[in-house]
Amino acid sequence: MTIEDRDDAHLITHALAKDTLSRLRDVETEQVAFRKGLVKLGRICGYEIIDGAMETEYVPVQTPLQETTGERVKGLDDVVIINVLRAATPFVEGLLKAFPRAKQGVISAGRDEEAGMTDDGEFPITIDYVKLPEIRPEDTVIVADPMLATGSTMCAVLDHVLDEADAFEDLFVLSAVSAPEGLVRVSESVPEADLLTVAIDDRLDDDGFILPGLGDAGDRAFRTV
């Protein structure tokens, strides 16, 4: 398992995850490569969740030559992935390669950039659309957003998820890059969530962007800059 437990989050340390993130950070990485990189990173993170949080069971297997015993991952039918539009779309595409039978939810959420960041480091959040599947007590819920900056968007999203879910097996908040400020805000607001990230960066700038970060993941993936 390549997940390192930190006080503020669980850090995914897989070599391919770090390699892919480094390419995503590079300003020279163009749109198609950036989008494919987010897909790849989502797939790697999905495999890490399977390896670190899911159990296996022994099953009989008939090979072409004889019967033997194999292992299957338990709970792959009991996964709910929440896509925080829009930047998470390619990230979630990768997660679905690891969890092809997962149910999907969608929440469209974004900062009110015109209002700006408050003195306590939060943004007003606008949520335009929410569509969630049934969340059952046996489900593993993964809320995916590649950037966890101030944590304002994620906290607003988690409010909706928790309103719909009376119980669940596990709740993961998954990001590619996180700021320390956002990790603290989310962990204090939703202590039952397990925070997973590939990198914990230095800080937020005065506009609430992660430094060094990788820029605006949505703009780079969808070429809206």
Swiss-Prot record:
Enzyme Commission number(s) from the entry: 2.4.2.9
InterPro entries: PRibTrfase_dom, PRTase-like, Upp_A, Ura_phspho_trans
Recorded catalytic activity of this chain's protein: UMP + diphosphate = 5-phospho-alpha-D-ribose 1-diphosphate + uracil
GO terms of molecular function: GTP binding; magnesium ion binding; uracil phosphoribosyltransferase activity
GO BP: any one term: UMP salvage
Enzyme class: transferase
Keywords, comma-separated and alphabetical: Allosteric enzyme, Glycosyltransferase, GTP-binding, Magnesium, Nucleotide-binding, Transferase
Record's cofactor remark: Binds 1 Mg(2+) ion per subunit. The magnesium is bound as Mg-PRPP.
UniProt xrefs under Pfam families: UPRTase
Cofactor or coenzyme needed: Mg(2+)
Activity regulation field: Allosterically activated by GTP.
Residues the entry annotates as binding GTP: 36-40
UniProt: uracil binding residues: 210, 215-217
Pathway membership, UniProt: Pyrimidine metabolism; UMP biosynthesis via salvage pathway; UMP from uracil: step 1/1
Positions of 5-phospho-alpha-D-ribose 1-diphosphate binding: 86, 111, 145-153, 216
Stated role: Catalyzes the conversion of uracil and 5-phospho-alpha-D-ribose 1-diphosphate (PRPP) to UMP and diphosphate.
Family (UniProt): Belongs to the UPRTase family.
Name this polypeptide is given: Uracil phosphoribosyltransferase
Species in which this protein is naturally found: Halorubrum lacusprofundi (strain ATCC 49239 / DSM 5036 / JCM 8891 / ACAM 34)
